[in-house]
Regions:
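Generic structural signal for hydrophobic core residues of well-folded globular domains
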Residues: 1, 46, 73-80, 137
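Nucleotide-sugar-dependent glycosyltransferase catalytic core
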Residues: 3-38, 78-87
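Phosphate/oxyanion-binding loops and surfaces in catalytic or ligand/nucleic-acid-binding neighborhoods
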Residues: 4, 73, 99
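C-terminal, non-catalytic tails of nucleotide-sugar-dependent glycosyltransferases
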Residues: 34-60, 101-104
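Short, charged, amphipathic alpha-helical segments
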Residues: 56-64, 86-90
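Amphipathic alpha-helical repeat scaffolds of TPR domains
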Residues: 60-76
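Membrane-interface aromatic/basic loop that binds lipid-linked glycans or pyrophosphate carriers
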Residues: 79-141
């Protein structure tokens, strides 16, 4: 981008409180495939070699953004709980590991994603409990 123009015009008006809003947990779970698509595109766009050419602060910002996307995708798929959703959860982590191995361990084991990605039935219940606690503390959704 070489030139940017600002136009002081509302292009979209967001009404708070509608049941079908994208921040509604049930709606987010229904639309998780869109979330996964964007997450995959982010992982693909910021591979290790590409990051070396970016400004250090921008690379760190993108790492944090992918971490957030992985965390959200993981908990939404866990909340869904269906066999298909749980397989998608495994698949997105495998995709991250295959496409960007340098990011896999720091995101999986060294970030907030750790607290929503425990294995097994008990681990899934613990992950959902952690999510519900964070939701109460930070007042999101």
């Amino acid at each position: 981008v070489k030139t940017l123009y600002y136009i002081d015009t509302d292009l979209y008006r967001y009404y708070i409180g509608r049941a079908d809003q994208s921040v509604n947990e049930a709606v987010m779970i229904r639309r998780v495939d869109q979330q996964l698509l964007v997450t995959r595109l982010m992982i693909q766009a910021y591979k290790s070699d590409d990051l070396k050419r970016l400004d250090r602060k921008l690379a760190h910002c993108m790492f944090n953004y992918v971490t957030m996307m992985m965390t959200i995708s993981t908990i939404l798929l866990t909340l869904d709980g269906s066999d298909a959703a749980l397989q998608k959860r495994v698949d997105i982590w495998r995709y991250l590991k295959a496409e960007n191995p340098d990011w896999y361990a720091p995101i999986r084991y060294g970030s907030v994603a750790t607290f929503v990605n425990f294995p097994g039935e008990f681990g899934r219940r613990l992950s959902i409990g952690n999510y519900r606690l964070a939701r109460r503390v930070y007042k999101f959704n």
